[in-house]
Amino acid sequence: MDVVKSLAERFSAPLKENYKRRIIFWHDPDREFEQTIDEIAIPNVKVLKLTGSNNFYAKMLLSETDIENNYLVYNPISYQDVKDNWLLDIECYSEEFRADMLSIRMAEYNMPNNSAMRKALKLYNKFFENKERAGKLASLHSDYTSAGQLHIDIIAVLSGTSMNTASGVIRALLLNGLNYDENPAVKNIQKFGNEDIMWELINRYTGFERTEGATFDGLAAHILLTALSVTMSKSSLAGLEKLISEPHSSLCYALVNEWMHSDFDDELYDIARVVEDKLHLATRFDKIEVAELLNGECFPCINECIIRRFMTEISENIIKVEDIVRATNTRRTMKWYKRVRHYYDGLLQVANMQKFNRDHIAGFHIAEHSKLFKAYCDEYYKMDTYYRQFHSALGKSLKESSTVLEDLYKNVADYVENLYTNWYLNTLGSQWNKLTFDEFQKDSELVDIPQQNRFYNNQISPLLQNNGRVYVIISDALRYEVAAELCDLLVAETKGTAKLSAMQSMFPSATPYGMAALLPHKQITLDENLKVLCDGMSTDGTVAREKVLKTVGSGNVAITYKELLAMKQTERREKVADAQVVYIYHNTIDNVGENRPTEDQVFEACEDAISEIKNLIRVITNDLSGTNILITADHGFLYSYKPLEEKDKADKSFVSGEVHELDRRYIICDDECRAEHMIRIPMSNMNTTLVGYAPLENIRIKKSGGSMNYVHGGISLQECVVPVIKFKNMRSSNKKFVDVRKAELQLLSQSRKVSNSIFTLDFYQKEAAQGKVTAATYDIFMSDATGKAVSDTQTIIADKTDSDAMARTFHTRFTLKSAEFKKTESYFLNILEKGTTNIVAREEFSIDIAFINDFDF
């Protein structure tokens, strides 16, 4: 206690001339130290406590009994008449000490000793009776230039928060519960703080009036709606004016924004849900135009209203492509987006599909099969990707079920199914069948299209001429559109180069035929047991395929993905030490798709396959120092989400003659066989007199067992266009090496002066995010010279792929926090890579606004 130190210094000071001892009278008329005086111990000093009934004893002690020792005389008694003071004569030659508790507390907390601070401190005597509370106050290390900060700190301690700002304590009060009577923070304030001060702070910061029956759920509604008024028009909030304080809008917006980016965002979500349910905000927002809702961030139901609107319209065959894209791009950087991101992802894919439909509404009228094949590889495949990504999003949303939106999402899936299956697959398939009908009846290998049957000679042999090792990853059912996504990721995420091309698969587009075609051979043969041979050798299984590989190189290796990953690094290196060619067999997609119980997870398996192949490439390049890697597949696949209608199924009765093999998408039979509504395809390229039949377009052949929605074996572009990715790992010393870099963001606005608490700035993405330039996410905020944030934080995702520079701009709104800004000081706009402290750009600004923290009360 500082008072003990002060007294000790007084007693240790030199005595006046002719004085042999020191007597100090401590007057404490308010009895602030009455309970602690007995704890005071000062070396060589005795303590005498006056009680009002020991006056005679005290007088005798100090004047007769003990005239040698130093004495501290504690006197809590007030005398109406000095004549009542028995020790007045002794006081006249003694010293006086006064130390009221307020002064001591002010000194202890480095507070200015002025009337305003003394008045504030007097409100909290009960607070300071507890050492733990007093210690927590000290731990805040506040600079008490005003009584307002003391009030805030007291509320912070009693609310259980270290956020000792006006917004921080208001947030803490609400986090303690919306039931005012049961709120533990309020109960603490009522006992040890000052409830009136708490309400005055709330009113000054938020504009919320303390009226009879005022509650914290009302306060929460007021804060959230006042914050929302910053981003929504008055007309949209008509009827809610009593819950909004326009002069406090920027302060409430800053409070909510700060809360959103804190560790208590889940609690804010729950509070916002309570408010929107109580005020029926979803019903209100359902009637407002989507454009008006786009920037509203406070309430989760806004996302649901936007999504519901679009999904309802889609179910009614109204698809606003540009509006959906704009909404998704706007909402994705907002707080509650992640909770509904799969719904937005699904909507975006619907918009992509609709745009594709709009661009090709006249159909796919290309006159030559080779040109249609190329058009599919260049552009048409994207529709397959959109469909896959839609259903991936749908599947993920069902795992995070929202009863509000789930049924609508399924209605949208019906629309998507109709667009994809009935328009795209049937229209594209019909044109492909039309162009290839006669060609296929001549030969299963179409002219002017690269053939899977010559993969080894065309792709591997040229790479071996440089005496390098070639790794070949064969991923079962890695269809072209999935490989296209993989190729883009390899370019963007690795130091290597990746180029995608395509070839026509063997017919049937099934594993035994495709796997054989990818091996080195002079002749593929289909024997009497329907086994596919390469130059008379079996190709069934990894062991058999390795034997075929060894015919062109004794050290060549065939191994499965799982076997390779299970090996240690030294084992991997030993395995391929003598190999010129290494075939690695990967089977994730087909393994899932071929099984009826799991076929509906095939699109999820596609995502897994992409991740696994990327990992496999890291193993090859890092552990095995591989440079040349080819990624291909045995075949593609067709998949439709909805069960097919009877009209899309063909019965075996359509076939006359002896059938040797029948699957959903092909038949192998004797030459004499005939099949209605199918394309006859000779199989002479496998040295057999047997022939095949393939159903038209999207039709499946009925059979028992196996998958129905996931199929392959036929001649649709989705099945027979087989990808070839040529990946070359590049070292930084290579002249052709191009490193991956993130798309940069640059401030476009010319002015460097802020003159309003809410202001907007324009930013520019310097390059299109494609190839080796990858998308990047940035956090942007204003700070003072010390780096302390003085504004909210906004996020920009720099992933625009437009070649037009003007299409790569961002218009972003910021809100300053409650603070005093000096126009003579420098402030800085900071652009950081999200999730890091890496500042990629910093621009100096001045702030000139009349915006002073006025919470000194």
Go through each PLM region and give its residues:
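…; additionally, a secondary subgroup of soluble metalloenzymes is captured
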Residues: M1-R469, R479-I629, A633-F857
